[in-house]
Structure formats: C-alpha cells, structure tokens
Amino acid sequence: MNRFVMLTMSLIPLYGCSHHAPMATVDYVDVDRFMGDWYVIANIPTFLEEDAHNAVESYSKNTDGSIATTFTFLDGSFDGERKEYNPRGYIKDTESNALWGMQFIWPIKADYRIVYLDADYTKTIIGREARDYVWIMARTPVLSQEEYEELVQFVGSIGYDISKMNRVPHSWPDQPIGNKDEKEMS
C-alpha cells in the first residue's frame, strides 16, 4: 500500500502536463468590445452542450471586474427545453485580457483562452490548453462556408482533432440560416 501511495504522489506533478506545445492567445483583447452576444457556430462540446441548438454565449462586465456570462441553448432540437448556465469569468492575464478562468462551480476555474479574434470583433475562437473543448463563435448565427472552413482549419493548426467538431444548428426567425441542422464539419 505504501508503494502505491508513493507512486500516486510522485505522479501528481505530472497531472497538469500536456503533450502539446503551449497554446498561444491573441495579443490583446479590448474587453469592452468583446462583451455582448456570441453565437456558438461550432465546437468540440462539453457533455452539457452535445446536442445544443441556437447556442449563444453572452458576456457583460461586473463592477468587480469579473465577467458575467450567460450561456443559453435549446436542448436536443429547435423545440427543445431552453437551458441556461451562468458561469463567471475572471481575467487572469490583464496585459492581454485573453486568458480567463471560467468558474461554473466554486472554487474551480476552467481554462478559457481567446486564441483567435478578428480585427472587427465579429469572430472568435475560444480554446483550452488541454485541447479537449473548443468554441468557434460569431456575432451572427451564420458564417459563409469559406469563413467557417478557415476557422476550422485554424482550430486544427493549434492542435485540435477537427474530426470531433460539431456544427451547432441555428434557426432564428429574422436571420437567413446557412447552417441549420448541420451537425458535421462539412
């Protein structure tokens, strides 16, 4: 038993190690411009969002500097139950504002990295150092196929297995939808 405990204890420092190169973030995020609604276009989903439709992540600044986050989606179909989660974001790197901790349950803050952000703040990619989950998001629920493919290729270039990507279905009454009911990467 003592050998087992010693072996286990000796492996603890390796727990956080990854076989990937460190994941770079964007150089700088203007937090005020980043706030607002982001449609989740595609992802490698967590178990909570595996069959999400009309997924939207919304951010707003709290007076204490944290980020109030509202993640909503319809579960299973466009007629599915509306789900809502409210994690709190914490900016961990105030020089770039691109490295956050996202807290769903106290005291755990999940890794949240803004790894891509276009100049006009209309498209972003959120990644994690472990490369287990990723989110492609945009200010509109529709991207052209060319834009979508470019973003998916970027996800692949930073070490993700893009065969695990899901395209999130969107159907909004006032928007022409180009990716409705598409679950595969295309």
Describe the residue ranges of each PLM region.
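Sec-dependent signal peptide recognition
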Residues: 2-8
